A protein has these predicted regions:
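Glycine-rich phosphate/pyrophosphate-binding loop and the adjoining helix
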Residues: 148-185
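Active-site-proximal loop->helix
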Residues: 40, 65-68, 95, 112-124
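Glycine-rich phosphate/diphosphate-binding loop of Rossmann-like nucleotide-binding domains
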Residues: 15-59
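Short, glycine-/small-residue-rich phosphate/pyrophosphate-handling segment
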Residues: 111-157
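Glycine-rich phosphate-binding loop
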Residues: 67-105
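N-terminal beta-loop-helix "entrance" segment that forms/cooperates
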Residues: 52-74
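Short glycine/serine/threonine-rich phosphate/pyrophosphate-binding segments
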Residues: 32-36, 61-63, 83-92, 111-114, ...
Length: 185
């Protein structure tokens, strides 16, 4: 990602600095943290404060309940929950809160992440989890920012700049590839 002209975390309309985490990241084990680095990279780039917690739906259900209560009290706007294997954490969180939950299924285990993906996308009626692709931590960060942009105008502008940058990168790649193709013809 390229740096852009946004230098502060202030909301453009109000001028207030956002001092609380807007995004919470939940992961069931420290072993999975390295697969989520891109979330932090994206949120830092867009100047969105976040926090991360180790929460396991099956191994620490009481902690999961406390975690959700705390997030609601803090005013967190989006939760990103990751998991591998049965990956019940995103669904459990979604069943206990009205805060939007983004699920990130992680590769691993016998089915190489397919069980995680299916667990997240097959949620029952009324308990949605916005599920990303396997190991799509980057897209989870972007999607969280898009949700936040509905409330925080500075993010909408930053996302527009980011999309323009993606477009420019494709154009640059096309020019380079076309040039190399002509040289080898």
């Amino acid at each position: 990602m390229k740096k852009d002209s946004f230098a502060t975390t202030k909301e453009r309309d109000s001028g207030k600095t956002i001092k609380r985490p807007l995004v919470a990241i939940a992961v069931p084990s420290t072993k999975l943290l390295s697969q989520l680095n891109e979330i932090k990279t994206v949120l830092d780039f867009f100047q969105v404060l976040s926090e991360i917690s180790i929460v396991a739906a099956h191994r620490s259900p009481k902690k999961t309940l406390r975690f959700i209560d705390e997030l609601e009290r803090k005013g967190v706007n989006v939760i990103i929950a990751a998991g591998s294997g049965s990956a019940h954490l995103p669904g459990m969180i979604a069943s206990l809160t009205t805060i939007p939950v983004i699920g990130v299924p992680l590769r691993g285990g016998t089915l190489d992440g397919m069980d995680s993906l299916l667990s997240m996308i097959q949620m029952p009626h009324g308990v949605p989890v916005g599920t990303m692709g396997l190991n799509s931590a980057y897209n989870a960060g972007i999607f969280a920012c898009q949700i936040l942009a509905l409330k925080y105008p500075y993010l909408k502008e930053k996302l527009k700049v980011h999309k323009e940058t993606l477009e420019e990168e494709v154009e640059d790649e096309d020019r380079l590839q076309s040039s190399e193709w002509r040289q080898h013809s």
